[in-house]
Amino acid sequence: MRSDSIKKGLERTPHRALLFATGIPKSEMNKPFIGVATSFTDIIPGHISMKELERFIEKGIHTGGGYPFFFGIPGICDGIAMGHKGMKYSLPSRELIADIIECIVEAHQFDGIVLLTNCDKITPGMLMAAARLDIPAIVLTAGPMLAGYYKGQRRNLTSDTFEAIGKFKKGVLTEKDLEALELCACPGAGSCQGMYTANTMACVTEALGMSLPGTAATPAVMSEKRRLAFETGVKIVELVRKKINARQILTKEAFYNAIAVDMALGGSTNTVLHIKAIANEAGINLPLEVFDEISRKTPHLVNIIPSGEHYMEDLYKAGGIPAVLKRLKDKIYSNPTVSGIDIKEIAQKAEIYDENVIRSIKKAYHKEGGVAILKGNLAPDGAVVKQTAVSSKMLKFEGIARCFDSEENAMKAILDGKIKEGDVIIIRYEGPSGGPGMREMLSPTSAITGMGLNESVALITDGRFSGGTRGPCIGHVSPEAARGGPIAIVKDGDKILIDIPKRKIEILISESEIKKRLKNWKPPKQKIEKGYLLRYARNVSSADKGAILE
């Protein structure tokens, strides 16, 4: 066992002394040492239930014949970090999480690891660590939040708080409504209720084979989640004994399966960044084109908020990810999972309990999957759009550029009523390096939707979008503005063409004019002059490469 390097032999006398100082009984010293990376915090709703899950994981590890050691991992709530300086730290925290887990696991030579996670950048950071370390590993996502209720209707974070700001400015909602929605939109523990980034990544994790069947959609408050936590603890010891390492599960086929499930769910565009980053750690190259190829062949079968009317709890009741896999059984590859059951067998045995929530391929919401990859002279290296959240009338759109060099300036213009029908909002210098941190533009997109402009105004950015975004919102524009991408030289009044079916994004000026503007462009001064973000800005790759550190 790996842990023998810290507990066996004469030279390890001081190591054993320190281990005994923790209270470990001598009888447990020959058991596999299991690290449990817990991201519990009481500021993220999706993580407040983890203390109880920790206890069930612990019981499971003991039952399986291992000995657990818990250690803490930081987490950021993207919703609370949204719309201000804090969002600059969200994506960079993904790399920190992976690095911290690597440091702790290697320093203490754990035999296997349980990764307790739930929200946006924490889950991919943990999966990156698992792929990098290539030891036995299993993920437990803590589960989605239930719907809130107000005036007899189901409520959720995005449409009933973020979009409510625009509705209030337009006079659709009263101040009393806003105050009430603040108190009831998010009723308790769990990741936010829709197919936003946290829940999409939980579904991707299960489709990768890195969590037990049923884990992703089971709500945080269900007793079933505790049983899954217990089984996760039992299973990690089995994985250690069978010497099944993470990369035996994280194969190219696993990533193709995960992308297919993501496309069928109409998931968050952030998964493009995260799946690429995880694959990179596993030594697998996933070009952007792979996402588009799989999307073109995978129908959109599940329509959960923000693009649809269903909630994560509906997906749970309908059969969860195993049921989605059943729909896709002819489109996925055979591959092992942490459960010990092949993903194809999980799909075969699954039951579908609601045909309206998980549609058949013949009755798909859309013939293609959730994400489309666009290219053109505005984004030579690619851009990403959630095409299933765009109305049919906006799939092809030509508009006039309105340029802003920060999210804040764009947000002010939107709320001040300065954005009109036919405008294409350009938000730049918000990329991985230029931001730095590639902030999510949920506040501007929600304001656009709340003010009723989501079918007449488009938004293009080198930043990102929350999984809660809907409408013609194109992000991850590469190269980014700060590194001389063409988005940097767009001017107010330029005509912009978006053609999602043809995968085009163009600035309608001559090639000679583009070259002239690029020649005259000068990079702006770095916004950050110290700390982690400065190091991140200097070393982060472009979005088309997953915004990984190089």
Swiss-Prot record:
The protein's Enzyme Commission number: 4.2.1.9
Family indicated by similarity: Belongs to the IlvD/Edd family.
Stored Gene3D superfamilies: IlvD/EDD C-terminal domain-like
Role description: Functions in the biosynthesis of branched-chain amino acids. Catalyzes the dehydration of (2R,3R)-2,3-dihydroxy-3-methylpentanoate (2,3-dihydroxy-3-methylvalerate) into 2-oxo-3-methylpentanoate (2-oxo-3-methylvalerate) and of (2R)-2,3-dihydroxy-3-methylbutanoate (2,3-dihydroxyisovalerate) into 2-oxo-3-methylbutanoate (2-oxoisovalerate), the penultimate precursor to L-isoleucine and L-valine, respectively.
Organism: Thermodesulfovibrio yellowstonii (strain ATCC 51303 / DSM 11347 / YP87)
Protein name: Dihydroxy-acid dehydratase
UniProt xrefs under InterPro entries: Dihydro-acid_dehy_C (IPR042096), DihydroxyA_deHydtase (IPR004404), DiOHA_6PGluconate_deHydtase_CS (IPR020558), ILV_EDD_C (IPR056740), ILV_EDD_N (IPR000581), IlvD/EDD_N (IPR037237)
A Pfam short name: ILV_EDD_C
Binding site for Mg(2+): 78, 120-121, 440
Pathway listed: Amino-acid biosynthesis; L-isoleucine biosynthesis; L-isoleucine from 2-oxobutanoate: step 3/4; Amino-acid biosynthesis; L-valine biosynthesis; L-valine from pyruvate: step 3/4
Ligand binding ([2Fe-2S] cluster): 119, 192
Active site residues according to the UniProt entry: 466
Reaction(s) catalysed by this chain's protein: (2R)-2,3-dihydroxy-3-methylbutanoate = 3-methyl-2-oxobutanoate + H2O; (2R,3R)-2,3-dihydroxy-3-methylpentanoate = (S)-3-methyl-2-oxopentanoate + H2O
